[in-house]
Structure formats: C-alpha cells, structure tokens
Amino acid sequence: MYLSAQAIEALEGVRKVHLLDAKAVRINKSLGDAVGMTQLGIHQISVPPGHFSTEFHCHRYEEEAIYVLSGSGVATIGDCKQPIGPGDFIGCPINGVAHEMYNDGDEPLVCLVVGQRLAQDVSDYPRLGKRLYRNSGEWSLVDHADIEHVAR
C-alpha cells in the first residue's frame, strides 16, 4: 500500500500520554495501521518542546528503531545522553539498555518509529522500579521488588 506525503500530512494524529509519566507526550500517526500492516508498528511521532517521547524503558522481546525527521532533542540511551537531530538513527535491540528522548528544542521533534507487534512483551522501567507484562491485549504492571525469580 502507498501513502503520499499529502495523505500522511492529512492523517489525524492521536495525542498519547504515557501511563507512567505525564511529561511523556507525543502526537502519533500510525502509518502502518493506515495501510493495514499488523506485524510492524510504523509511526510518525511528534514530541512537543519540553516533553519526553516515553518513560525511560527497555523491551525484553520487541525491537524498536527511531529515525529523526526534524527537530532536535536529547536521547538517553543507558547512561549516555546523546544530542539528536534530523538524519540520526537509534536502534533498540531486545534486552538492550533503557532509552528515551527529550525535546529540548523550540519546535516539535518528529521521528519515524518502527517496532515489532508481538502478542507478548515485557518492558522494564528502571527509574521507576516497574515492569510491564503485555499479553494479548492485557497489561499488568508490577514493582520489580515484587517479582519472585524461580530457579529451574
């Protein structure tokens, strides 16, 4: 399927606020949904100035990739803070380090974000000491301290 630049511009963006961080706000245009894709999430996101893209997190099963289209910001990748701008790329492999982006500019930070759409995933939020289990549409959030690791 094909989407023209004009069709993408005309798509209505959905404002999303992260469930764990009210400062993590983005406008999401799901390009993949618009053409019927089900296995990959492909989104154009716009992060307003002074906001984060998401809560600092990492995925245990889904890979994620980010390509900066316009604007500027700072990506936190593990312990590193990296200035980002148009043409920069961030790859987030499974079991990688936690990551987030912050828009420190005065215009929207616009990125193309691509990620898998598995039925199950586990995301860790290390700053909050939380883990999110996602299983076929059901989401369960737990404190890291409450996770009992069982030896096999």
Language model segments and positions:
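Conserved short histidine dyad/triad with adjacent acidic residue
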Residues: 25-30, 43-59, 94-95
